[in-house]
Amino acid sequence: MQKNFLSLALLGALALPALTAAAGPFSLDEAIRHTLNQNPELRAAGHQAQAADARADAAKGAFLPQIDVRYLARRSDNPLDAFADKLNTRSVTGADFDPARLNSPDTSTLHATQLSVELPLYTGGRRMAGVREAGAYAEAARLGYERHQQAAAYNALHAYRAAQAAAEAVIIANDAVEAAREHAETAARLVRQGRIVASDRMTAELNLAAAEGAREQAANRQRLAIEALRLVTGMPADAELVLPPWGAPDAVAALASAAESEQRALATRKDLKASEAFVRASRAKVTTARAAFQPQIGVIAADSWYDSNAALDNKSQSIMGVVSMNIFSGGRDWHGLTAAHHDTEQNELRLEGLQQAVRGEVRAATSRLTEASARRAIARQTADKARENVRLVKQRYGEGRTILIDLLMAERLLVEARNEELAAGLGQELSAAQLQLAEGSLSLPGDVPTR
């Protein structure tokens, strides 16, 4: 069933059509699904997992009898071959023992067909170790594929939210341009009325130009963010993407302690489990290497047919037991066993190093999320205060109790506060996803094929 599911996932990758704006807004789940189906590295990991499954099935075949058929056609005037052909075809006569005929036989033609069945009975544990090794490699490949899925899903989420935030930044920039244009028009009118000096009008015009320049920068960042989203999801370069508007993320719930998150990661991270599977595979390889020092016992049964033509005639049967043991192989077996031990130690140390790295990732992700949550709370309060400040300064400016530069400064602070609130919200959402990825708990869309 696992292989069937993975096959469906790979077939879906080839069949999934490119999404267009005609299908409606491009949702986050759609972006993740498209990434999982179109990402070349992920598809390669899926094929790697299928190949490992096939090798695991092949290893199990070592416990089944091996059946072979062999056909041979030969012409020879070799004395031994010629006499053996007569024996095998049961055509020996008394005249065939004449020394002259034995030493100088006529050319003999033989057609031989053999059907044999071979079954190893004891291999020193090599067959079972081979099954364990191949099974562990298959498990490691499957877990590696699932970890690739989570990493690809995070990359899609990152690109998607960044594109949404870039679109929201354009809205903020448009609002800033509209406010700056309003102030520039007001300043121009007041100059004509002689109520303010010309330098105030120029200040308002410079403020408008700065706002328009910032809007161009925001629009370019949005284009780059959409292009990055197309690249991550595997969308065509000319695909038109329509995203739903940015929605501020909810406040972060109470975080678990770093120790709890570390334990969760050590228990659930797919790459850690894959590394553990590599350790099991290398230990099985040690058992396989040790089998070279054990006797090999097997049984072979065969039916053979011999004739001067291709017909199946003159059948003979044989059955034999075989016991073999290598005495000297030039040190190959000893060196192979030593290498297997070193491979095991290497994989155990890599597992230990990965465990330490995972702990560090979880601690760093927890710290980033704590910082991002606090930063967003501050940014939200600051944005609210900046809006109220603009309202009050506008009121005072309309009453003639403050100067234009104060109003422009208040508007600029509001733009900065809104951009900071947006950046803090994006940082909080990405930090939360990074923590889930570090813990190995990042969820995928429900209909994504998994093994």
Feature-to-residue mapping (PLM):
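Gram-negative bacterial Sec-dependent N-terminal signal peptides
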Residues: 2-21
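Charged, alpha-helical scaffolding/interaction elements associated with membrane systems
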Residues: 37-39, 154, 193, 268, ...
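Small/polar-residue-enriched beta-strand and adjacent coil segments characteristic
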Residues: 25-27, 66-147, 257, 264, ...
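Bacterial Sec-pathway N-terminal export signals of envelope proteins
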Residues: 21-72, 78-80, 120-121, 237, ...
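Amphipathic alpha-helical coiled-coil segments
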Residues: 44-59, 148, 152-173, 182-184, ...
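DHp/HisKA histidine-phosphotransfer helix
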Residues: 24, 41, 130, 200, ...
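Periplasmic alpha-helical coiled-coil/stalk elements that build and connect Gram-negative outer-membrane
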Residues: 26, 147-264, 365-372, 414-415
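Short, glycine-/polar-rich solvent-exposed loops and beta-turns at beta-strand/coil boundaries
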Residues: 61-64, 152, 197, 293
